[in-house]
């Protein structure tokens, strides 16, 4: 997880673009190349004066969900927690067999951090096993609200999937009480035992990073890895 990656643009006057600052600090500290997983906005890699390997955790997460719903994939609907991540949800739906797609319409108060209100579901989720996908869970307000509106819209179940589990403040309690069948995260952010519960699954991102590092240091062709997506479990990764 790249720190301050969500602050990649100004939402109002006099706000800093902290994501650019972090890249500049890494460059000043001596970094020649950056490798990161699921940046909040892929275009922010342009802030760094040097090569950036933007890895995507989707294959690791998709493999797990495919195995989890192996006998009922035809009933899975992929849901984006907001309109801004609908393209990611489309990629998820494609890799899970082309099932239905939906997103949660929400409004956000830009003067207050981590304040968003989930209003309604756009798309048909009634009777569906919903997979709610996001890049990062911080205070879990958005995700908990999305779970609530999905349940109100008739969803059979909701499984929350995200790459980065920051889990700050009330996040754990919100997720426990959200009604989600399961919360699936990766270990890009260490999750201590006191923030774990029975409904949480944490997947290792180590094989993804190891494969990318090997490609870089053995002078392999990173470009050839961009479209790699094996059909069997446990290997491969994507770049963006």
How would you describe each model-predicted region?
Residues 1-240:
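PRPP-associated nucleotide enzymes
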């Amino acid at each position: 997880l790249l720190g301050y990656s969500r602050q990649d643009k100004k939402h109002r006057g006099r706000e800093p673009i902290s994501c650019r600052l972090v890249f500049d600090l890494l460059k000043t500290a001596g970094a020649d190349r950056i490798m990161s997983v699921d940046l909040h906005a892929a275009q922010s890699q342009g802030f760094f004066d040097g090569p950036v390997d933007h890895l995507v955790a989707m294959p690791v997460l998709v493999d797990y969900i495919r195995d989890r719903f192996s006998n009922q994939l035809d009933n899975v609907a992929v849901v984006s927690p907001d309109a801004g991540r609908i393209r990611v949800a489309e990629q998820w739906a494609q890799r899970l067999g082309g099932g239905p797609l939906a997103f949660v319409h929400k409004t956000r108060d830009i003067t207050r951090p981590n304040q968003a209100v989930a209003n309604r579901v756009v798309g048909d989720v009634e009777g569906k096993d919903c997979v709610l996908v996001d890049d990062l869970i911080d205070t879990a307000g958005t995700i908990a609200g999305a779970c609530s509106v999905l349940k109100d819209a008739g969803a059979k179940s909701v499984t929350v999937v995200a790459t980065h589990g920051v889990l700050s403040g009330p996040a754990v309690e919100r997720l426990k009480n959200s009604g989600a069948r399961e919360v699936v995260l990766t270990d890009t952010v260490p999750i201590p035992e006191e923030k774990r519960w029975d409904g949480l699954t944490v997947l290792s991102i180590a094989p993804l990073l190891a494969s990318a590092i090997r490609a870089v240091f053995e002078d392999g062709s990173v470009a050839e890895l961009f479209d790699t997506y094996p059909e069997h479990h446990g290997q491969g990764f994507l770049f963006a």
